[in-house]
Regions:
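Conserved ATP/PPi-binding loop(s) of AMP-dependent carboxylate-activating enzymes
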Residues: 201-202, 212-236, 256, 273-275
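Conserved pre-ATP/AMP-binding loop-to-beta segment of ANL
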Residues: 12-31, 37-38, 64-75
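ANL superfamily adenylate-forming
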Residues: 1-23, 136-138, 342
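Conserved AMP-binding A3 loop
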Residues: 27-54
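Conserved AMP-binding/adenylation subdomain of ANL enzymes
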Residues: 50-75, 82-123, 127-146
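Flexible lysine-rich "adenylation lid" loop at the C-terminal edge of ANL adenylation domains
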Residues: 337-353
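AMP-binding/adenylate-forming catalytic core of the ANL superfamily
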Residues: 219, 224-225, 248-328
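Gly/Ser/Thr-rich phosphate-binding loop
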Residues: 114, 120-124, 132-194, 207
Length: 353
């Protein structure tokens, strides 16, 4: 996999542009999604941004080598809000390299804008991916107007959905990153089925380690700190410069990384047992009757909150019963049905608090 060196970026200099005296100084502030608490201002520098950019461009070298498509002529459709770090870093990366970036007015106008502005690639969150998937499976791919590369991030994706799209000619790239790392972290450009549940290969721009299962990162993409919040900064940035992501992960010998949950999301039962809600949500994902689900704790029991059609509730109960038979007793789930879609933030992440 090709890596773009820092020197490549510094070569994009023009005589009429004054060089910034300190690339490590704060240049802009992005806010965290606030899925488990209040949103925090993340202080980022130009150095953070430009060292993270290669992670957003490198996968397209893989697209070119694996498909033969001319990615130099690609245009992208940006549907994520600009306060999302992935949207910001992608926009700057593609603009710097001379690509066309089409901006979607609002998500509700997605199909209108995609039809008006032909785009080869787009970053998607689970809700948007599900809509694209439904169109493809219903034989309505013409609505996508040539869209063929999907970069997936912000949450876990159903591997069966990804495989179906790949079987129908889409190139799927998965990503892992945080606002605190300027979106950098890992990219998965492999089209092999065995890697569909991986967020990707660790990135050369950072160092990685696991501390009690928690993924920690250190390197140039890591933030300066939280704006006017030294206490919160000290909770995640240690004295040696390691950023504690809060994500529980494992890294296999081949370098591929797998996320198993969020440290803050872990449910601690009265028995002392720890339960990862994301682990159970993955087990429920294959159920076709489930539109959305979120696992949480209700009265010291594990509860699966499910959004589905009313006539599919029995099918959901049967599926959960089958899953429970494969689990230890303390992980057994009860089902609670929701008539409304589950709450999400603007980036498509479930709001768990």
């Amino acid at each position: 996999m090709t890596r773009w060196p820092w020197a490549w970026w510094t070569s994009w200099q023009r005589p009429d542009i004054t060089e910034v005296p300190d690339l490590s100084a704060m240049a802009f502030i992005m806010f965290t999604s606030g899925t488990t608490g209040r949103s925090k201002g993340v202080m980022l520098s130009q150095k953070n941004l430009f060292t993270a950019m290669p992670a957003f461009l490198t996968p397209f070298e893989d697209v070119r080598s694996q498909t033969g498509w001319n990615t130099d002529e690609f245009s992208s459709l940006s549907c994520l809000p600009m306060f999302h770090i992935s949207a910001m870093t992608s926009l700057v990366s593609w603009s710097v390299t001379g690509h066309c970036v089409n901006l979607c007015n609002e998500l509700k106008y997605f199909y209108r804008d995609l039809g008006a502005m032909r785009s080869d690639v787009m970053a998607v969150v689970p809700v948007l991916l599900k809509s694209i998937y439904n169109d493809v499976m219903k034989g309505k791919r013409e609505r996508l107007n040539g869209l063929r590369v999907l970069t997936c991030g912000a949450a876990m994706f159903n591997p069966a959905v990804l495989q179906d799209l790949m079987d129908r000619g889409f190139f799927i790239a998965q990503m892992y990153g945080l606002t605190e790392t300027c979106g950098d972290g890992a990219w998965n450009s492999s089209q092999e089925e065995k890697y569909l549940t991986s967020v990707g290969h660790v990135d050369d721009s950072c160092q990685y380690k696991l501390e009690d299962g928690e993924l920690c990162m250190r390197g140039d993409p890591v933030m300066l700190g939280y704006y006017k919040d030294p206490e919160a900064t000290a909770e995640v940035l240690d004295a040696e410069g390691w950023f504690h992501t809060g994500d529980i992960a494992r890294v296999e010998p081949d370098g591929y990384m797998y996320l198993t949950g969020r440290k803050k999301n872990v449910i601690i039962l009265g028995s002392g047992e720890n339960v990862s809600p994301e682990e159970l949500e993955k087990l429920l994902a294959p159920c076709a009757a489930i539109r959305e689900c979120m696992v949480c704790e209700r009265n010291q029991r594990i509860c699966a909150v499910v959004c589905c059609d009313p006539d599919q509730q029995d099918a959901v109960r049967d599926f959960v019963t089958k899953v429970n038979r494969t689990l230890p007793l303390y992980k057994h789930m009860v089902v609670e049905f929701s008539a409304q879609p589950l709450p999400r933030n603007a980036a498509g992440k479930l709001l768990r608090s």
